[in-house]
Swiss-Prot record:
The gene is rps2. Keywords: Ribonucleoprotein, Ribosomal protein. The keyword Ribonucleoprotein applies. It holds the Pfam family Ribosomal_S2. PROSITE patterns: RIBOSOMAL_S2_1, RIBOSOMAL_S2_2. Gene3D superfamilies: Glucose-6-phosphate isomerase like protein, domain 1 (3.40.50.10490). Belongs to the universal ribosomal protein uS2 family. One of its GO terms (biological process) is translation. This is Small ribosomal subunit protein uS2. NCBIfam families: uS2_euk_arch (TIGR01012). The keyword Iron-sulfur does not apply. Coiled coil: none annotated. Disulfide bonds: none annotated.
Length: 202
């Protein structure tokens, strides 16, 4: 059964991909596996895995440089940056400057053909501009997110350090695999730790 998953189920669980929040939206109901006694909603990892397979095939159809990945969230910044390095996609870790996709006068103006949003709520500016220019939106969504304007939702813990690293690592591997740049998933030798934001303890 483990073979059905892109990574062993234990790896998803160890990274906390399934850990949601204590809030849920009607939109996300279909992705929720159960609610714990403490009120925390748990995501269905099988659905996460299925959506990652679909997203990998979908994103592989685009020219690498026409894909944009964004994350305002701190723990998503290293995964997004590494994802860009590995796949050739454009990455904007940190603050998303208003007008980046809509105003040619902005310094780093860029018109992507598809965008990957780490959190629709935190990345609201990028989301707004993607809607404005009418490009497909692939979004990592947690139990409290809305799916309005999201074309392809990947249900996951979109706040956790290890969860975000694993999701972007799998997505990068799937894109390379579906592009034919690697002939098997085992050929992808970059460790998931390279996608992980490091905690600096003072």
């Amino acid at each position: 059964m483990a073979d059905e998953y892109l990574v062993p189920l234990d790896q998803y669980l160890a990274a906390g991909v399934h850990i949601g929040t204590q809030q849920k939206t009607k939109d996300m109901k279909k992705f929720i596996y159960r609610v714990r006694q403490d009120g925390l909603y748990v995501l269905d990892v099988r659905k996460t895995d299925e959506r990652l397979k679909v997203a990998g095939k979908f994103l592989a159809r685009f020219e690498p440089q026409s894909i944009l990945a964004v994350s305002v969230r701190l723990y998503g910044q290293k995964p997004v940056k590494k994802f860009g390095e590995v796949t050739g996609a454009r990455a904007i870790p940190g603050r998303f400057l208003p007008g980046t996709m809509t105003n040619p006068a902005v310094k780093n103006f860029f018109e992507p053909e598809v965008i990957i949003i780490t959190d629709p709520r935190a990345d609201h500016q990028a989301m707004k501009e993607a809607i404005e220019i009418g490009i497909p939106i692939v979004a990592l969504v947690d139990t409290e997110n809305l799916l309005s304007y999201v074309d392809l939702a990947i249900p996951t813990n979109n706040k956790g350090r290890k969860a975000l690293a694993l999701i972007y690592w799998i997505l990068a591997r799937e894109i390379l695999y579906n592009r034919g740049e690697i002939s098997s998933r085992e050929e992808f030798k970059i460790p998931v730790e390279e996608f992980e934001m490091k905690i600096v303890r003072r």
